[in-house]
Amino acid sequence: KSKENEDRILFEVSYNILEFAFEKATKIQEVEERFTEYLSVIQSILGEDDHELQGKGIHPFWDKNDNNPVQSPRYEMLMQYLSMSKTLKLKDLHSYPEYGAFICGNQIQLDVSKENFISVINVFNQIEAAKAYLFANSEFPDSSWNTKIARDIFWEQSMHGILQENAGVN
């Protein structure tokens, strides 16, 4: 947690993925400034050992990393749930239940007034497809999936996707 504000940098699901959670801001540029500053410090530290953060939807070294969850009941439960796909033998599920530890995405939470709620929702709905393609997807070289949106396949053809309300744009 930052000493100057409520920003937090934490591990998301596994120790391979960092989450940046920012305090409320009046302008998105304020968040961008803080993100740029944090990223610069982190990249400098990681660079000392020839590592770096990359903005990819799938960790490029997913098959070499320790994909165990962060020791937290929430993440341990998530990974156990995803692993149920091995025993349920449901049709059309992929064989990578550990994917929760090496894929990442983006989330945006905005505070909006009642007056502009509908227009804000409409704008975000219009950019959702582009946002998903640009920020949350990647190729997955270990599979026969000939796509640049492998993150969607991980999600939709897993235990997450067996519930229709968890997959696609609803």
Regions found by a protein language model. Give the residues of each.
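Phosphate/nucleotide-binding catalytic core
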Residues: K1-N170
